[in-house]
Amino acid sequence: MLQVKDTLRATVQVSFDGRVYKVYHGPDAPKRFDNEVRILRHLEARRCGFVPRLLEADPSKLRIVTTNCGVRVEHLDAERLRELFAELEGFGVRHDDCDMRNVTYRQSDGRFCVVDFELATILPGFE
């Protein structure tokens, strides 16, 4: 597997078949794991097409497996970045870390996607 992220909060690896494995560690790891699982399920129920799909969630290992949403974006216009996160709010989720490091580009359909929902919140009225 290719390791793409290794921080105090999480390790992320991409398998050869393209699935993304994220393991949570550090402060509040169980809480962040639970939150990301809840947010991804919320977005899938609303058919949000520009976020990863949750394939597995293992609370005993604090690990999720998701679909791959492409490669990290190096440059994105500030206005387009705002539009992307505003579009996400239309599905009832505020990301709370609206940074380019949480945006990928999926070449298969030319779509910018949003990843990393461990700090996100579900907006009032969407719960």
Where are these regions (language model features)?
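Short hydrophobic-acidic sequence motifs that mark active-site Asp/Glu residues
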Residues: 12-14, 20-22, 51, 65, ...
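C-lobe/activation-segment region of protein kinase-like
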Residues: 90-94, 106-127
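Structural motif
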Residues: 15, 58-60, 106-108
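Conserved structural core of kinase catalytic domains
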Residues: 25, 29-33, 37, 41-84
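Hydrophobic residue at the +6 position relative to the catalytic HRD Asp in the kinase catalytic loop
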Residues: 98-105
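Short, glycine/acidic-enriched loop or turn micro-motifs at the edges of active sites
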Residues: 70, 100, 119-121
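Acidic active-site catalytic centers that drive phospho-/nucleotidyl reactions
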Residues: 36, 97, 116
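ATP-binding glycine-rich loop module of kinase domains
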Residues: 1-42
